[in-house]
Amino acid sequence: MSTLIECGASPFIPGFALKDVRLENGLTVRVAIGGSGSPLVLLHGHPQNHTTWRKVAPTLAQNHTVILPDLRGYGDSDKPTSDPAHRTYSKRTMAQDIVMLMDALGFSRFAFVGHDRGGRVGHRLALDYPDRVTCCTFIDIAPTATMYALTDKSFATRYFWWFFLIQPFPLPETMIAHDPAFFLRKHISGQLKIEGATSQEAFNEYLRCYQNPEMIHAICEDYRAAATIDLDDDAADTSARIRCPLQLLWGGLGTVGQLYNVVGTWKEKALN
């Protein structure tokens, strides 16, 4: 049985209300909801939370019921203790969270947009729950297995955190916790191609969450899962294809667009 607690208006996104939704699996997810119409879920990446969508959510809410969850381990959602196999933060587990969230909100089918980590959750979501997803968009990602398989010096240098965060506990946790603001600032500045794209207000919100040791550990577990159990799950589903219409977006100056054939790699994973 899921439960829902109203948490007031969003201080970052006009017209959106905050809710804490306790899912059937016991996890509590913080979510911002606004607008009306067909349901559209926006899944954020690392190191952000749902507020990363603050500039586009109000416009999308003119035609959709827009649902902005904090992924498990991120923002103000629960950060459960992980397991040795990292299954707690596998994309399969995180995708199940989203389906349970939509069940709790009363939506049987929905579209979603996933950026970065959210896109990887979305990939598994589209594979495991094809009857629930009407269409989907991935922003700035190639398939996880492809990116690992084609890793070279350029990718490893630009995406250093992929290899730092997967180191055994407590190495990355200890180093990040020593100065979360420094790590977060360097991480974000290394990704930005447009100066000022992340405002000071947004940075402060991300830092508020990043200063929580439980979130630091959860983020590391998210990446550890990506390098282990997620690859195992993908290998077991090599013949599976995304059945719903898939839209791909990426930045022309970004690493993914420069290093990978984005459309070509996803054509191998999707039917549409």
What are these regions (language model features)?
Residues 51-68:
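Short amphipathic alpha-helix adjacent to the substrate-entry channel of hydrolases
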Residues 2-20, 25-29, 36-39, 52, ...:
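Flexible "cap/lid" subdomain of the alpha/beta-hydrolase fold that forms the substrate-access gate
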Residues 37, 45-48:
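Active-site glycine-rich loops that stabilize anionic/oxyanionic intermediates
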Residues 42-45, 68:
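Structural cue for short, hydrophobic secondary-structure segments
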